[in-house]
Amino acid sequence: SVGFKAGVKDYKLTYYTPDYKTKDTDILAAFRVTPQPGVPPEEAGAAVAAESSTGTWTTVWTDGLTSLDRYKGRCYHIEPVPGEESQFIAYVAYPLDLFEEGSVTNMFTSIVGNVFGFKALRALRLEDLRIPNAYVKTFQGPPHGIQVERDKLNKYGRPLLGCTIKPKLGLSAKNYGRAVYECLRGGLDFTKDDENVNSQPFMRWRDRFLFCAEALYKAQAETGEIKGHYLNATAGTCEEMIKRAVFARELGVPIVMHDYLTGGFTANTTLSHYCRDNGLLLHIHRAMHAVIDRQKNHGMHFRVLAKALRLSGGDHIHSGTVVGKLEGEREITLGFVDLLRDDFVEKDRSRGIYFTQDWVSLPGVLPVASGGIHVWHMPALTEIFGDDSVLQFGGGTLGHPWGNAPGAVANRVALEACVQARNEGRDLASEGNQIIREASKWSPELAAACEVWKE
């Protein structure tokens, strides 16, 4: 017979390698695989490894021009998921050479680009990634990180407080700026553009930036504290986005914001580099994340999106609340909160962490708790998230019966009371409600808030 051995072949012959010892430079992935009936797990795992690296559906003669052993992804371990029939965790190792340096975009295109529509699988979910040191070092990461942010803001030893300005759509720029001023004047550290606020007919971005900057400087002068407003620079093109960031820098404001999933990783990394070069902090909103991470058996877990963001760059990222209106299981949430903040995180399956991750001194990201939280949640939030976090109360500030500024006062008083109680050694988990009640005795603003949002 002439030629090479053509034809469709079993993936597992080439791509299932249980004896493989993973290298320090490999990118490791943990996939939750649900094969179609009759497809053995080894074949399904191997198919994932193949389709997300060098494989194609049939043997091609150009395979002979390269070294498959050097470039192929390998499925090196498979384990059944306890309590689920026909679900498996497939571990895949990718050689580092398959990826462009410093590009989250390319990393995702390779690992999750094609394989999720694969016929042999009923469903596929990327649960976790281990990014090797060598690859982490090709990324700039967050523009500034937690420590630098605290130094810029001169705020230490407590979580930071924020508030999303509502109604999210429809306010004029001047009224918007007024709401910003009231919240900051009342005692919040930050206010935030809603993720949908870009540049719409009722409020163009330049007008908003101007009035928010005015609000910020006025509040700063009156309180003696550094204030910020996350100016949303997200736009339809990268060029327009940078134009907005440049204007923010010219106004001298401390922080801008970006929707990193809808904006895309290329745009996000571009903005992140600009922010580091120009001393702007970068707040990241995760609009669209639930499209990707909500299904338990298909898509990508948020911890992967969080890791990707730390590589691409951002100083704050929304990461669920554990207590408010959006779902988030406590241990799992704490797992990816640690992945955002810490330099080194040990493998811990009970918290959903499949791999030990070393960030080799890449700056950390502040997790932002936001969504349906109010003053009664403050002790729990302080305890769960600790000092390095941003607690965002949108309705929990603006919904105060006396207005925005008293709403801000209520939140700040509640926070300071919780931090003080914790520092005195009291247990926030069991005494939380009592701590808030005590504080509300001398703060009418807090008392009114406690009344509106009963525990």
From Swiss-Prot:
Which cofactors must be present for this protein to function? Mg(2+)
Q: Which SUPFAM superfamilies match?
A: RuBisCo, C-terminal domain (SSF51649), RuBisCO, large subunit, small (N-terminal) domain (SSF54966)
Tell me, in one coarse class, where this protein mainly resides: plastid
Instruction: Report which reactions are catalysed by this protein.
Output: 2 (2R)-3-phosphoglycerate + 2 H(+) = D-ribulose 1,5-bisphosphate + CO2 + H2O; D-ribulose 1,5-bisphosphate + O2 = 2-phosphoglycolate + (2R)-3-phosphoglycerate + 2 H(+)
Q: Name one GO biological process term.
A: reductive pentose-phosphate cycle
Q: What class of enzyme is it?
A: lyase
MF annotations from Gene Ontology: magnesium ion binding; monooxygenase activity; ribulose-bisphosphate carboxylase activity
What is this protein called in UniProt?
Ribulose bisphosphate carboxylase large chain
Q: Which organism is it from?
A: Lupinus nanus
The UniProt gene name for this protein comes to rbcL
